[in-house]
UniProtKB/Swiss-Prot annotation:
Keywords: Disulfide bond, Glycoprotein, Hydrolase, Protease, Signal, Thiol protease, Zymogen. It comes from the Viruses. The lineage of its organism: Viruses, Viruses incertae sedis, Naldaviricetes, Lefavirales, Baculoviridae. It holds the Pfam family Inhibitor_I29. Disulfide bonds join 134-175, 168-208, 263-311. GO terms for molecular function: cysteine-type peptidase activity. Its EC number is 3.4.22.50. It comes from Choristoneura fumiferana defective polyhedrosis virus (Cfdef). It is an enzyme of class 3 (hydrolase). This is Viral cathepsin.
Length: 324
């Protein structure tokens, strides 16, 4: 056998999980079992299979074309891209230019910092969470940043209450969407944020049950950053801490592992937490914490190539807050 052909067969078979579109019916039955899926009717099952088949074709194509990342059948594979975005993200777009937070312009070239940096290695990032079908990514990303700020300042990890933001933030729209910097504004207006244990996550809009006596974090000031260079995020990340950023999530839905090189940039719809950066096989990348549980991606994280505005990571101003 030709050595090149043999290499390609081994490479594709290893990296793409050797999915075969002709085996879609068999994969679908395995999917139903593995993810405990049940449908209300035969017509609904057929509808979901057609979506699954379309997603499988996309997964196969991505595994062939984006050779530094791997994509797989996962819990979202019977949902259309629009369904996944509408149910499992939640970033809104501002109707006007809102600058409650102080705007800082960073127009100098990036410093010569370390090639790799990861706040997780310093134990300053809380565990991966799962927002479920509540569109509150904005709350998770913002509070993820505050959790890290608290850990940096007090050397202690604490989980904050996304549910408090969902119920009591009247600037944003709870499970129907919100913004990153306005979430900081809401925490400042409320006077603080409670721990998750005191105000547990329910994944739906509820009545505000604020208890100021149980605030564990209070926000002094918030900032938004204008970056002339995407690489400047490295300096900001090291100096400030993990940063909530906005992305287009449509191309990460079926992600499994690796560095994403090709990622849609058609409109921001999701918020995630930037926690680090590194280099793999000569390709620099960002490390991002998602809110789709540890059974997605790299134990809940994903990586995208730097300096190509992957997933639109540079389209919206990153933000941070200073805590008391």
């Amino acid at each position: 056998m030709n050595k090149i052909v043999l290499y390609l067969l081994i490479y594709v078979g290893t990296f793409s999980a050797a999915y075969d579109l002709l085996k879609a019916p068999s994969y679908f039955e395995d999917f139903l079992h593995n993810f405990n899926k049940n449908y209300s009717s035969k017509s609904e099952k057929l509808h979901r299979f057609k979506i699954f088949q379309h997603n499988l074709e996309e997964i196969i194509n991505k595994n062939l074309n984006d050779t530094s990342a791997q994509y797989e059948i996962n819990k979202f594979s019977d949902l259309s891209k629009d369904e996944t975005i509408s149910k499992y993200t939640g970033l809104s777009l501002p109707l006007q230019n809102q600058n409650f937070c102080e705007v800082v312009v960073l127009n100098r070239p990036p410093d010569k910092g370390p090639l790799e940096f990861d706040w997780r290695r310093l134990n300053k990032v809380t565990s991966v969470k799962n927002q479920g079908t509540c569109g509150a990514c904005w709350a998770f990303a913002t509070l993820g940043s505050l959790e890290s700020q608290f850990a940096i300042k007090h050397d202690q990890l604490i989980n904050l209450s996304e549910q408090q933001l969902i119920d009591c933030d009247f600037v944003d729209m709870g499970c129907d969407g919100g913004l990153l910097h306005t979430a900081y504004e809401a925490v400042m207006n409320m006077g603080g944020i409670q721990a998750e244990n005191d105000y547990p996550y329910e994944a739906n809009n509820g009545d505000c049950r604020l208890n100021a006596a149980k605030f564990v974090v209070k926000v002094k000031k918030c900032y938004r950053y204008v970056l002339m260079f995407e690489e400047k995020l490295k300096d900001l990340l090291r100096i400030v801490g993990p940063l909530p950023v906005a992305i287009d999530a449509s191309d990460i839905v079926n992600y499994k592992r690796g560095v994403i090189r090709y990622c849609a940039n058609h409109g921001l719809n999701h918020a995630v937490l930037l926690v680090g950066y590194a280099v793999e096989n000569g390709v620099p990348f960002w490390i991002l914490k998602n809110t789709w549980g540890t059974d997605w991606g790299e134990q809940g994280y994903f990586r995208v190539q730097q300096n190509i505005n992957a997933c639109g990571i540079q389209n919206e101003l990153p933000s941070s807050a200073e805590i008391y």
